[in-house]
A protein has these predicted regions:
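Acidic, surface-exposed loops and disordered segments
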Residues: 1-176
Length: 176
C-alpha cells in the first residue's frame, strides 16, 4: 500500500488520451465508499469527460499557482476529465468535518485513478460558478473541490526536502 501512496502524486500535465465514462464511474465508486464523519455521507459528485466541457473548465482552474508560466499546462496538456465534489448547503455538518470527508474522498479518487493508469490533482482554486453551470449542479449545493484527471504527461520524482519552509515546486525537463 505504501508504494501505491508514493506513486499517487499530483499531476498537472496530461496526454490527449481520453478517460471513459465507465472508468470515471469506477473511480467514483471508490469515493462513494469513503469513510464519512458521523457516517453523514453528504458529499455529491459530478463529472465530465466531454472534451468541449473539459476545455471550458480548464480555463477556470489554477494548476500549480507557484509555477512559472512556461511550466504551466497548455490547452493541449489539459485534463481529460473533471470530478467536482459538492455538498448540500443546508447540511448541519461543520465545515471542518466536511473538509475532512472531502480529503478522504479526494485521496480515494486519486488512488483509484492511479490504479487505472491515470494521474490526478486535487484543486481548490477554480471558478465555482462556471463549474456549477457546466456540470449542472443544483442551486441547493455548494461546490467544495475539483479533481482533474488524465494520463499523466509529467514525471514525479520523490525527494526529501532539505528545508521544511521551502514549499516551491521543483521542475526540470518535465520532472517535478
Amino acid at each position: 500500500m505504501i508504494e501505491k501512496i508514493k506513486n499517487t502524486r499530483s499531476h498537472r500535465k496530461f496526454t490527449d488520451k481520453k478517460i471513459s465514462k465507465e472508468e470515471i464511474l469506477k473511480i467514483l465508486e471508490g469515493a462513494r465508499y469513503s469513510a464519512s464523519a458521523k457516517n453523514s455521507q453528504f458529499l455529491r459528485y459530478s463529472y465530465t469527460v466531454d472534451d468541449e466541457k473539459c476545455k471550458k473548465l480548464f480555463s477556470t482552474i489554477a494548476l500549480g499557482g507557484l509555477l512559472k508560466l512556461e511550466d504551466k499546462p497548455t490547452l493541449e496538456e489539459r485534463p481529460r476529465a473533471y470530478i467536482l465534489i459538492s455538498a448540500k448547503k443546508d447540511t448541519n455538518i461543520p465545515d471542518f468535518l466536511q473538509y475532512f470527508d472531502i480529503g478522504i474522498a479526494s485521496q480515494n479518487i486519486a488512488l483509484l485513478a492511479n490504479e487505472l493508469g491515470y494521474g490526478a490533482c486535487i484543486v481548490m482554486s477554480y471558478n465555482k460558478n462556471v463549474f456549477k453551470e457546466v456540470l449542472e449542479v443544483p442551486d441547493d449545493y455548494e461546490t467544495r473541490a475539483v479533481i482533474v484527471l488524465g494520463e499523466a504527461k509529467d514525471i514525479v520524482k520523490l525527494t526529501d526536502s532539505k528545508d521544511e519552509n521551502d514549499t516551491k515546486y521543483f521542475i526540470e525537463n518535465g520532472t517535478h
